[in-house]
Amino acid sequence: MENPFEITAVVAREILDSRGNPTVEVEVYTPISMGRAAVPSGASTGTHEALELRDGGKRYHGKGVRRAVENVNKIIAPELIGMDVTWQRDIDTLMLELDGTENKSNLGANAILGVSLAVAKAAANALGLPLYQYIGGTNAYVMPVPMSNVINGGVHAGNELDFQEFMIMPVGADSFREAIRWVSETYHVLKKVIAEKYGKDAINVGDEGGFAPPMKEVTEPLETLIKAIEEAGYKPGDEIALAIDAASSEFYHPDIGKYVVAGKEYTREELVDLYKELVSAYPIVSIEDPFQEEDWEGFKLITRELGGKIQIVGDDLFVTNPKRIRKGIEMGAANALLLKVNQIGTLSEAIDAAYTAFRAGYGVVVSHRSGETEDATIADLAVALNAGQIKTGAPARSDRNAKYNQLIRIEEELEGIAHYPGRKFRNPFF
């Protein structure tokens, strides 16, 4: 008798992401289901991330992924045919063994992740379960508070802002649907505020749907956001709070051993003082990557100084890697993890990273990358983990709204039991 959960085919192809660059899409088939997943790609990448395999050469300016696609079709697929699609961890472990490297540089993290996520989706579909419930079980019910990146700087923009992202968080909303309405309304007012001050050229949107007006001083976007929140009819801090992704690796100058913000040099201690000034002047509740990816002492210092008051998120510091997360926990560096599935390369390892963080009392922010697709897996993952937070761009561009729309559907499915944590986003159960 045919096993309905047996993998019958694994097919990979090259598709385009939101930046028009190639990425990997994978389909996994069983006799009764199919799962499809597409892999995202980052612009500001941590040195310790799992390796994304690109072809090089002239085709797609070297960014083709035919090698990764071939690795799925020729190497991974034959090994998976006949396996039970619900054996997620076994399948992920097998792919790690097939690759045989620490950073997945042999087969490519983009090949392995595409298969890993497609396997989970095919299994969920075979069982007739929504993906968040398949991954998280019956206890998956916490909706995430959106961290919406509405003003861009750094490598995401062509302006002079050194900090990469300025975000709004609707902490005073009662539900996800209400939260996303507040974000959308504020975003549209922000567009008007920026156009009035900086002109129409300043309201073109970046990779993640945010605006990149010609600002330089870090206080400019914060002042602009406060104005937009108030004009949209909301209270800054009480209803909509602010968050920053400094992405400090991008403005650290190793030749002088200092950080350069708006043309001014800062030592580690001086940069902590700048963050403290910003937190006391504005309703900032979260700062991501306040120091460069190897500045463990800087993270330790800011966590000691501000960690009792706000969330300190490690992205490039941790790169979703359980070993680096454990080091941070031991040192008291940061108090939250930015979870990007493509930094580590399999669903099982991403879940392990999240639970390593949770067990230490750290928060977890499930995150997109700047190069995305219509794939909305991270929306389901945020609910599956009860993470309480998601970072997936401005409420603009279909690649970002695909995630928000999926969360609206999930909240509707969980009618009566869905919990929106609001201000308790870092520890939604306490």
From Swiss-Prot:
GO biological process: glycolytic process
Active-site annotation: E208 (proton donor), K340 (proton acceptor)
Entry GO terms, CC: cell surface; extracellular region; phosphopyruvate hydratase complex
Binding, Mg(2+): D245, E288, D315
Reactions that this protein is recorded to catalyse: (2R)-2-phosphoglycerate = phosphoenolpyruvate + H2O
Domain of life: Archaea
EC number(s) recorded for this UniProt protein: 4.2.1.11
One Gene Ontology MF term: magnesium ion binding
InterPro entries linked to this entry: Enolase, Enolase-like_C_sf, Enolase-like_N, Enolase_C, Enolase_CS, Enolase_N
Residues involved in (2R)-2-phosphoglycerate binding: Q164, K340, R369, S370, K391
Cofactor requirements of the protein: Mg(2+)
Keywords: Cytoplasm, Glycolysis, Lyase, Magnesium, Metal-binding, Secreted
PROSITE patterns hit by this protein: ENOLASE (PS00164)
Keyword Metal-binding: yes
Membrane-crossing segments per the record: none
Principal place of residence: cytoplasm
Subcellular localization: Cytoplasm; Secreted; Cell surface
Pathway: Carbohydrate degradation; glycolysis; pyruvate from D-glyceraldehyde 3-phosphate: step 4/5
Cofactor comment text: Binds a second Mg(2+) ion via substrate during catalysis.
Stated role: Catalyzes the reversible conversion of 2-phosphoglycerate (2-PG) into phosphoenolpyruvate (PEP). It is essential for the degradation of carbohydrates via glycolysis.
Homology family: Belongs to the enolase family.
Name of protein: Enolase
The species this protein was found in: Thermococcus onnurineus (strain NA1)
